[in-house]
């Protein structure tokens, strides 16, 4: 008897071709479209695409509404993190709670043996590994997935190139339209800018003071939630001739502190809410502090459920609230959330 796989289907080329690969490998495939955020127009388009793909491939498509859970687990933390002057990473939270949380629960319900997605990542059932296509690798966003479920996960695209996937889809009658769809690289529930979305829930536009690193008022800004660490535009600095960057944010006083690029240098971080795939308490490894950045050599000490990370070279513009993800070569070792820099 063939093994049953529940495949997350978004209506995009990656999940569509993943379904085709899984069928070719002999799996019994059923699709799942998850309604996450409350954007009817978005779902109308993407659910229709997912259904078109499922019909073409001859697989059953389930549709479930997860908006309430998404709001609690992803959207509210997104708003709260910005309100605290930090920079959130909603995709990592969504992957843990919904795409590999609620989806796995649904897989149990229908008797599926595995869960699959079109993510560009690899796994051997014990660890995650970076995808072969380093321009599309999504391992950074999956660091928070519970390690106990790795044996149940399949990623058909982990050893493929994105260009290969699009070329294959383009060559098949019935799938060519999926190859030509415009890709979305932004947060799926943010239609324009994150501040446009936030202003429906919190006061975003509120003029405040710009301070230099000595505490002197040197200008004004349009509201602290418009800024993230390292930003260099959108505020005034009286008499400045050189570029100034946001080096910290004080949400309680609606202030941003700015300085020169060297003031952004960071040599250590502290991480909380850890998700580690190793039990080691002190080790040397590498860490990525943002998506699509190089891994920095570091030393890690786990003390009282927090990771104290000493960087072996300076990194500029490290944002509190973002994910820090550990790698041993291309092997993902887990990570945590930047609490202090």
From Swiss-Prot:
<feature type="binding site">
    <location>
        <position position="34"/>
    </location>
    <ligand>
        <name>ATP</name>
    </ligand>
</feature>
<dbReference type="GO" id="GO:0000049">
    <property type="term" value="F:tRNA binding"/>
</dbReference>
<dbReference type="InterPro" id="IPR046885">
    <property type="entry name" value="MnmA-like_C"/>
</dbReference>
<keyword id="KW-1015">Disulfide bond</keyword>
<feature type="site" description="Interaction with tRNA">
    <location>
        <position position="119"/>
    </location>
</feature>
<keyword id="KW-0819">tRNA processing</keyword>
<feature type="region of interest" description="Interaction with tRNA">
    <location>
        <begin position="290"/>
        <end position="291"/>
    </location>
</feature>
<dbReference type="InterPro" id="IPR046884">
    <property type="entry name" value="MnmA-like_central"/>
</dbReference>
<dbReference type="GO" id="GO:0103016">
    <property type="term" value="F:tRNA-uridine 2-sulfurtransferase activity"/>
</dbReference>
<dbReference type="GO" id="GO:0005524">
    <property type="term" value="F:ATP binding"/>
</dbReference>
<protein>
    <recommendedName>
        <fullName>tRNA-specific 2-thiouridylase MnmA</fullName>
        <ecNumber>2.8.1.13</ecNumber>
    </recommendedName>
</protein>
<keyword id="KW-0808">Transferase</keyword>
<feature type="region of interest" description="Interaction with tRNA">
    <location>
        <begin position="136"/>
        <end position="138"/>
    </location>
</feature>
<keyword id="KW-0547">Nucleotide-binding</keyword>
<dbReference type="InterPro" id="IPR023382">
    <property type="entry name" value="MnmA-like_central_sf"/>
</dbReference>
<dbReference type="Pfam" id="PF03054">
    <property type="entry name" value="tRNA_Me_trans"/>
</dbReference>
<comment type="function">
    <text>Catalyzes the 2-thiolation of uridine at the wobble position (U34) of tRNA, leading to the formation of s(2)U34.</text>
</comment>
<dbReference type="InterPro" id="IPR004506">
    <property type="entry name" value="MnmA-like"/>
</dbReference>
<feature type="disulfide bond" description="Alternate">
    <location>
        <begin position="94"/>
        <end position="188"/>
    </location>
</feature>
<keyword id="KW-0820">tRNA-binding</keyword>
<keyword id="KW-0694">RNA-binding</keyword>
<keyword id="KW-0963">Cytoplasm</keyword>
<comment type="similarity">
    <text>Belongs to the MnmA/TRMU family.</text>
</comment>
<feature type="binding site">
    <location>
        <begin position="8"/>
        <end position="15"/>
    </location>
    <ligand>
        <name>ATP</name>
    </ligand>
</feature>
<feature type="active site" description="Cysteine persulfide intermediate">
    <location>
        <position position="188"/>
    </location>
</feature>
<keyword id="KW-0067">ATP-binding</keyword>
<feature type="binding site">
    <location>
        <position position="118"/>
    </location>
    <ligand>
        <name>ATP</name>
    </ligand>
</feature>
<dbReference type="GO" id="GO:0002143">
    <property type="term" value="P:tRNA wobble position uridine thiolation"/>
</dbReference>
<dbReference type="InterPro" id="IPR014729">
    <property type="entry name" value="Rossmann-like_a/b/a_fold"/>
</dbReference>
<dbReference type="Pfam" id="PF20259">
    <property type="entry name" value="tRNA_Me_trans_M"/>
</dbReference>
<feature type="active site" description="Nucleophile">
    <location>
        <position position="94"/>
    </location>
</feature>
<dbReference type="Pfam" id="PF20258">
    <property type="entry name" value="tRNA_Me_trans_C"/>
</dbReference>
<dbReference type="GO" id="GO:0005737">
    <property type="term" value="C:cytoplasm"/>
</dbReference>
<feature type="site" description="Interaction with tRNA">
    <location>
        <position position="322"/>
    </location>
</feature>
């Amino acid at each position: 008897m063939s093994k049953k796989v529940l495949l997350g289907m978004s209506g995009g080329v990656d999940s569509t071709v993943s379904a085709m690969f899984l069928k070719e490998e002999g799996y019994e495939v059923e699709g799942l479209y998850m309604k996450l955020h409350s954007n009817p127009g978005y779902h109308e388009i993407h659910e229709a695409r997912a259904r078109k793909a499922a019909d073409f491939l001859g697989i059953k498509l389930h549709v479930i509404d997860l908006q309430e859970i998404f709001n609690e687990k992803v959207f509210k933390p997104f708003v709260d993190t910005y309100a605290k002057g930090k920079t959130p990473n909603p995709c990592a939270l969504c992957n843990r709670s919904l795409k590999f949380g609620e989806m796995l629960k649904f897989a149990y319900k229908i008797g599926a043996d595995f869960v699959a997605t079109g993510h560009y990542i690899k796994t051997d059932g014990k660890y995650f590994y970076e995808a072969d296509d380093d321009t599309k690798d999504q391992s950074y966003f999956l660091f928070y997935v519970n390690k106990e479920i790795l044996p149940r996960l399949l990623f058909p695209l982990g050893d493929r190139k994105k260009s290969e996937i699009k070329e294959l889809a383009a060559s098949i009658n019935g799938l060519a339209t999926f190859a030509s769809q415009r890709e979305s690289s932004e947060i799926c529930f943010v239609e324009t800018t994150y501040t446009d979305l936030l202003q429906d829930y919190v006061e975003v536009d509120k003029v405040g003071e710009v301070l230099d690193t000595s505490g002197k008022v040197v200008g004004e800004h349009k509201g602290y939630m418009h800024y993230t660490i390292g930003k260099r535009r959108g505020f005034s600095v009286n008499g400045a001739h050189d570029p100034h960057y946001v080096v910290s944010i004080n949400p309680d006083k609606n202030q941003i502190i700015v300085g020169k690029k060297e003031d952004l240098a960071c040599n250590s971080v502290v991480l909380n809410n850890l998700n580690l795939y190793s039990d080691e308490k002190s080790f040397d490894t590498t860490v990525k502090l943002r998506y699509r950045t190089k891994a920095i050599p570091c030393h890690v000490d786990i003390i009282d459920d927090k990771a104290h990370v000493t960087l072996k070279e300076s990194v500029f513009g490290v944002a509190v609230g973002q994910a820090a993800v550990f790698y041993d070569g291309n092997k993902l070792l887990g990570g945590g959330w930047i609490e202090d820099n």
